[in-house]
Amino acid sequence: MKIAVDAMGGDNAPAVVVEGVERARDRFKDIEFDLFGDPQQVRPLIKDATRINLIETTEMIEMGEEPVRAIRKKKDSSIVRAAVAVKEGQADAFFSAGNTGAILAAGLFIVGRIKGIDRPGLTSILPIAKPGSGAKNFVYLDSGANAESKEKNLLQFAQLGRFYAENVLGVNNPRIALLNNGTEEDKGDRLHKEVHQQLKAQGDLNFVGNVEASALLAGEADVIVSDGWTANAALKATEGTAKMMLTLIKNGIENGGLRAKLGYLFLKPVFKKIAKLMGTSTYGGAVLLGLKAPVVKTHGSADALAVENTIAQIHTMIESKVIEKTVSYFGQVQSEENIDKPSKN
């Protein structure tokens, strides 16, 4: 298998990208990499070029650029060239830590949607923080690709999330939940009420009802679906709360005197374990599900471990053939819908 990598994307690129790629190359003997970027910056960083091909690009899409305009104007950028390589069958997947909007636009307009999918969903893997929970993480989509969604989009997100949980996370009959402002069936606006009823009626989904944002990390479902605006706001609120708690704990230790500092020394291993559980480097990147090939974006501040784990995630996606299975499912659904349509004659 071959992965097309945007070597120039991210706050710490290309150094951490190259380091992460080399670590993944050593870990997975069946992966070859095409690194797209500026040879003058990238080549000196490569310690061992085994199964790493450096492909020169002359342009770069910056973090603040307008996404669609950027991919249309900068045809020789590392993001566009990597996406084109996937479209033309020269690579099996596309990975970047760069401009999120540009990656989404390149995935949508260059790699292309699966037939039958109206809108792809940005899919994050989040940790389950509840002690004693059997699962370690869950699938969360759409985490920001679509600010507005229709009922059909959320139903498709549920199916996309199901396939991902089954094939990539190895969850049997994953529990599907709808992010809402209450657990009761009649909660939410018209959209959420209607989606709830339609998810409930889906015979091939293990729908377990609504889940509130306060229970987002509680392990109540293996897949949580939402419109992109709500899901992104809930995710950022959760991240902000976690950061604030860490700040309060740190402040308490620093200003709590000798007793607090001694207590921290005893609890340091526990804090490290929690940091690893909640760390963004642990779970890989966000996948734009609903496209014809894996398009995966990790956060801009990613370190080499995050790059390595994101590539491991892509490796599992390719090995499990989750995209092929998704294509087959939605192709069948579309065929059935066409049969059910009344004839114009």
UniProtKB/Swiss-Prot annotation:
GO terms for biological process: fatty acid biosynthetic process; phospholipid biosynthetic process. Signal peptide: none annotated. Its EC number is 2.3.1.274. It is found in: Cytoplasm. Keywords: Cytoplasm, Lipid biosynthesis, Lipid metabolism, Phospholipid biosynthesis, Phospholipid metabolism, Transferase. It holds the Pfam family FA_synthesis. It comes from the Bacteria. One of its GO terms (cellular component) is cytoplasm. Gene3D superfamilies: Isopropylmalate Dehydrogenase (3.40.718.10). It catalyses: a fatty acyl-[ACP] + phosphate = an acyl phosphate + holo-[ACP]. Homodimer. Probably interacts with PlsY. Catalyzes the reversible formation of acyl-phosphate (acyl-PO(4)) from acyl-[acyl-carrier-protein] (acyl-ACP). This enzyme utilizes acyl-ACP as fatty acyl donor, but not acyl-CoA. Belongs to the PlsX family. This is Phosphate acyltransferase. It comes from Limosilactobacillus fermentum (strain NBRC 3956 / LMG 18251).
